[in-house]
UniProtKB/Swiss-Prot annotation:
InterPro entries: aa-tRNA-synth_I_CS (IPR001412), aa-tRNA-synth_Ic (IPR002305), Rossmann-like_a/b/a_fold (IPR014729), Trp-tRNA-ligase (IPR002306), Trp-tRNA-ligase_bac-type (IPR024109), Trp-tRNA_synthetase (IPR050203). One of its GO terms (biological process) is tryptophanyl-tRNA aminoacylation. Its EC number is 6.1.1.2. CDD domains: TrpRS_core. It is found in: Cytoplasm. Catalyzes the attachment of tryptophan to tRNA(Trp). GO terms for molecular function: ATP binding; tryptophan-tRNA ligase activity. It comes from Mycobacterium leprae (strain TN). This is Tryptophan--tRNA ligase. The keyword Lipid biosynthesis does not apply.
Length: 343
């Protein structure tokens, strides 16, 4: 089956579990979403969600979660997501996500769910007493997020491939019993997605789950702090600036970062730094990053100072999302034989 709009649908989202998105989020994901809006406006209908329901698989302070949900949405807009071209909304504003998650949970084998790698890793770290059923069923909710919108393409990293495979499997399993219910989504990998690594551990990708904040370039950090972090970035004991991720991961990461925020290709940058030291590379990278993030931070500050614009965007987005996901739920409920509500 295909969507009635004729567009390919895309769904993606970010958890509101930090006070700021980091440069890896921006360059590895969200700027790619932005590019889709403008490069292929007649091909894709995009749904970009703040996935707050996923956030509560670990304990959250209510006021902090409320603020982080808004600031995450604000960063979507500040990075260039256009609510006139894409649907921007908050997951908990659309009941279909949890409704569909329950249905899909009834089609998910316990063994299949227990084999999800991220659950096993987190359960091992947290211990049985701290591991919730919500964390266990997290991938099923992810599948519901995707399938509720008849999603064709899901921009995901390698670490989420297993969860997307679950969504595909559940769609196919349901369709085998109730044909033509779900679109089976495919993985979407942008051609030029930047891979940004931790400044303090350049063999690990930049992630908000890192043990230390020292390696993260947060979009909303004070510029002076970003400069300090980049100047302290791990490099190596050599002096030559060349691109070699295996041998020189730290230097290569700085080159990637500078290339991503300036648009200058890495080979050109390497030629510029012939005869220069790591200090020059760090200085220039820091300046380029500050120039990139400063207008983003300014726009977020503006949106958060007066929430009217942001709240309207999220309300309109939730209505559009509910219109689409509600039709999916009606189709699912009809297939299952649930009694329709009358009146």
């Amino acid at each position: 089956m295909s969507t009635a709009t004729g567009f390919s649908r895309i769904f993606s989202g970010v958890q509101p579990t930090s006070d700021s998105l980091h440069l890896g989020n921006a360059l590895g994901a969200i700027t790619q979403w932005v590019a889709l809006q403008y490069d292929h406006p007649d091909e894709y209908e995009a749904f970009f969600c703040v996935v707050d329901l996923h956030a509560i698989t670990i304990a959250q302070d209510p006021e902090t979660l409320w603020r982080r949900t808004l600031v995450t949405a604000a960063q979507y807009l500040a990075l260039g997501i256009d609510p006139g071209r894409a649907v921007v909304f908050v997951q908990s504003h659309v009941p279909a996500h949890t409704q569909l998650a329950w249905v899909l949970g009834c089609f998910t084998g316990f063994g299949q769910a227990s084999r999800m790698t991220q659950f096993k890793d987190k359960a091992l770290r947290q211990g049985a007493d701290s591991t919730t059923v919500g964390l266990f069923t997290y991938p099923v909710l992810q599948a519901a997020d995707v399938l509720a919108y008849d999603t064709d393409l899901v921009p995901v990293g390698e670490d989420q491939r297993q969860h997307l495979e679950l969504a595909r499997d559940l769609a196919q399993r349901f369709n085998s019993r109730f044909p033509d219910t779900f679109v089976v989504p495919d993985m979407f990998i942008p051609k030029m997605a930047a891979k940004i690594y931790d400044l303090a551990d350049p063999t690990s990708k930049m992630s908000k789950s890192a043990s230390s904040d020292a390696g993260l370039i947060n979009l909303l950090d004070d510029p002076a702090l970003s400069v300090k972090k980049i100047r302290a970035a791990v490099t190596d004991s050599e002096r030559e600036i060349r691109y070699d991720p295996e041998v020189k991961p730290g230097v290569s990461n700085l080159l990637n970062i500078q290339s991503a925020v300036t648009g200058v290709d890495v080979d050109t940058l390497v030629q510029r730094y012939v005869g220069h030291g790591y200090g020059d590379l760090k200085k220039d990278t820091a300046e380029a990053v500050v120039e990139f993030v400063s207008p983003i931070k300014d726009r977020v500050d503006e949106l958060m100072a007066d929430l009217t614009e942001l709240e309207v965007v999220l309300a309109v987005g939730a209505q559009r999302a509910q219109d689409v996901a509600g039709k999916t739920m009606q189709r699912v409920y009809d297939r299952l034989g649930f009694l329709p509500q009358r009146g």
